[in-house]
């Protein structure tokens, strides 16, 4: 959907006779999509761009091509534009060894004046896009997997990211994703979680924030009660381990 919208808008803006207006709209509305796509084409001619998919969220736009995902900041002219990517990589590199659910393995490259974030595509469909009835049917299974993930992660205290902690280590605190609600990938056939993506706003905080993050921005998940069912499974793990 996003690819069609961006392509249509880009062609529509192309007929605007005043250049500065064309440039302004392409940068502000489409986030300089065409130049970023051309830069990626030039840097990675080996990719099949005919089957490219486009997504956007937070501060980035995402090109999904074959088995790879490429993220670039929407507003690449901003100061410290690379800082969020670098922060996310540090977090994921440090947390990954503690978790059995897949977390993106990030690398960077520059092309056409833009910094791209590249990671292998994790297979699956966004949990929020699965029908409510099906989520409810498999809610216990999903909640168990999420609880195990949060439990595993609660033991992560990597020295390499101590400088990113805003508070000292203490009981009940852990490294949290904070926004899992829209970033859980799941196999729609088995309904097993395949990955947790987009860690740029992760941080060290009270572990209760992780459960809130399962429903915070989605009324659908609030109605299902994914936070409560996951929290109950997590308490069982604490009791028996």
What are these regions (language model features)?
Residues 209-241:
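Active-site activation/catalytic loop segments of kinase-like enzymes and analogous catalytic loops
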Residues 95-98, 125-164, 168:
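Conserved kinase catalytic-core helix
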Residues 44-65:
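ATP-binding glycine-rich phosphate-binding loop
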Residues 114-126:
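Conserved short submotifs of the Hanks-type protein kinase catalytic core
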Residues 24, 76-84, 220-229:
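Short, flexible/disordered intra-domain loops and linkers
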Residues 2-49:
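Juxta-kinase regulatory segment immediately upstream of eukaryotic protein kinase catalytic domains
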Residues 60-66, 155-209:
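Active-site acidic catalytic loop and adjacent metal/ATP-binding pocket
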Residues 30-37, 58-59, 69-117, 133-141:
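A conserved alpha-helical element in kinase catalytic cores
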């Amino acid at each position: 959907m996003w690819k069609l919208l961006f392509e249509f808008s880009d062609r529509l803006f192309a007929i605007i006779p005043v250049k500065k207006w064309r440039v302004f709209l392409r940068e502000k509305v489409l986030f300089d999509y065409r130049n970023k796509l051309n830069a990626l084409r030039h840097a990675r001619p080996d990719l099949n761009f005919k089957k490219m998919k486009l997504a956007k969220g937070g501060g980035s736009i995402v090109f999904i091509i074959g088995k790879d995902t490429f993220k670039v900041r929407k507003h690449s002219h901003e100061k410290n534009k690379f800082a969020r990517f670098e922060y996310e990589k540090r977090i994921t590199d440090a947390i990954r060894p503690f978790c059995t659910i897949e977390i993106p393995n990030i690398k960077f490259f520059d092309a056409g004046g833009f910094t791209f974030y590249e990671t292998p595509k994790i297979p699956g469909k966004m949990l929020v896009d699965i029908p409510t009835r099906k989520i409810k049917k498999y809610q216990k299974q999903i909640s168990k997997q999420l609880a195990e993930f949060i439990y595993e992660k609660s033991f992560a205290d990597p020295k390499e990211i101590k400088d990113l902690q805003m508070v000292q280590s203490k009981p009940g605190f852990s490294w949290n994703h904070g926004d899992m609600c829209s970033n859980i990938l799941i196999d729609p056939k088995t309904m097993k979680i395949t990955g947790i993506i987009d860690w740029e706003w992760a941080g060290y905080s009270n572990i209760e924030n992780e459960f809130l993050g399962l429903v915070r921005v989605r009324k659908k998940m609030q109605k299902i009660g994914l936070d409560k069912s996951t929290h109950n499974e997590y308490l069982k793990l604490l009791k028996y381990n």
